[in-house]
Amino acid sequence: MSLWSSVKFAQRYAQLPKVFYRLVTPQPLDNNRWVIWNGELAQGFALPKHADDPQLLSVFSGAEPFSAFKPLAMKYAGHQFGVYNPDLGDGRGLLLGEMQNQQGQWFDIHLKGAGLTPFSRMGDGRAVLRSTLREYLCSEAMAALGIETTRALGMMVSDTPVYREQVEQGACLIRLAQTHIRFGHFEHFFYTEQYDELRLLADNVIEWYMPECTAHDKPYLAMFEQVVARTATMIAQWQAVGFAHGVMNTDNMSILGQTFDYGPFGFLDDYEPGYICNHSDYQGRYAFDQQPRVALWNLSALAHALSPLIERDDLELALAQYEPTLGKVFSQLMRQKLGLLSQQEGDSELFNAMFALLAENHTDYTRFFRTLSQLDREDEQTVIDLFIDRDAAHGWLSRYLERVAMEQTASGEAKSAQQRCEQMRAVNPKYILRNYLAQQAIDKAQQGDFSEVHTLAKLLKNPYDEQAEMEAYAHLPPEWGKKMVISCSS
């Protein structure tokens, strides 16, 4: 029985006119070998759990031609740090084709680090071990946290030298995503006045990903409304979990509201609203607390690109739904994190007082919520001890517990502290991919030891579980590991 006999492939994007892409032959790395294969994800596509068959490596690395694949580099544009750049496209990654999972959903197969393309500009078309490991681990960590994201099927390392600030090992990532269509795809066709192609792109987005929009009187408007809602939801999830993307250019924004293009990202350690994780972000444009604003800016840029298809008034009305949607979803997530069942007057003030307290005391964001989730097992003092200003912490905690008691009294189904805390532990992770943990795995991997990569990958699949034997990974970061800023070079 063939390795591929049960796998369903397609090449829908390759059926579009040639102006949408360029066909490119992958340039395999030297002595490619697996670092990690995501067996659980692979099984969902009828692929084997273990990557023992050498054909898996040769096909997914691009070393062996495969009839189901038609490798191509997409053309797009985008606003980078607010400045329009028309000269973008897949500069080091290739869309190989699509696979269908067992739920009937199609996923793009994208090989990142596949070599030069017509859109490589001054680059070499390669990805390095360091950044590839970070993307693999973070995309899978985000999926386990329940946040919309691209996925990682596997990654490889090679003997090919890649020249960045220093010589590094070349690597490749097999990224799966429901689409690789970005805001920047629409911007490219708009700014080059290729309006027929703009319409064709919108038609295919609707057909492939949002077929329900066809029943709408204004299907293009319905499509944009979905993009707005999905983006608002994604940003609310980022802010709730403490995730900073680092480089929210419009070419890094998925039209399906999925976290996309992991680069200089970071999870909050101490709660610092203005946290900047990208060392190239000198102005703090993409700081943690700016992400909601930037996403709206990006949606406005997309709206401008869609103006040949959608009336201006309709675009403005759709954009006006972004902030209410973001606020509603974020408040729901905060109530879940605090174990509150219902919405009550004064909740916003409670949240704002909490954020102010966390910021003033430089309290670890993830540990605070996880400790609050342990109040059925621990004394209140364990929460208060997280803060420098213990009196202020005691005051907020008393207010919070009054809010919990008031809800239980007012509601018909009062929950016990144990029930409430169990529900809180299911939404407040114990383990996140702190930058220092990723760096420790990278340091070992660069010496040829991938054990820490596998340890982290296993740990982060179940971020809400106690995993007592892994307790050290929940510790606060050492001083050198706090507020790490990451390079965009990958």
Curated annotation (Swiss-Prot):
Catalytic activity: L-seryl-[protein] + ATP = 3-O-(5'-adenylyl)-L-seryl-[protein] + diphosphate; L-threonyl-[protein] + ATP = 3-O-(5'-adenylyl)-L-threonyl-[protein] + diphosphate; L-tyrosyl-[protein] + ATP = O-(5'-adenylyl)-L-tyrosyl-[protein] + diphosphate; L-histidyl-[protein] + UTP = N(tele)-(5'-uridylyl)-L-histidyl-[protein] + diphosphate
Principal EC category: transferase
Cofactor(s), names only, from the UniProt record: Mg(2+); Mn(2+)
Binding site for Mg(2+): 252, 261
GO molecular function annotations of the record: AMPylase activity; ATP binding; magnesium ion binding
Keywords: ATP-binding, Magnesium, Manganese, Metal-binding, Nucleotide-binding, Nucleotidyltransferase, Transferase
EC number: 2.7.7.-, 2.7.7.108
Binding positions for ATP per the UniProt entry: 89, 91-92, 112, 124-125, 175, 182, 261
Pfam families: SelO
Active site location: 251
Role description: Nucleotidyltransferase involved in the post-translational modification of proteins. It can catalyze the addition of adenosine monophosphate (AMP) or uridine monophosphate (UMP) to a protein, resulting in modifications known as AMPylation and UMPylation.
Family recorded in the similarity comment: Belongs to the SELO family.
Protein name according to UniProt: Protein nucleotidyltransferase YdiU
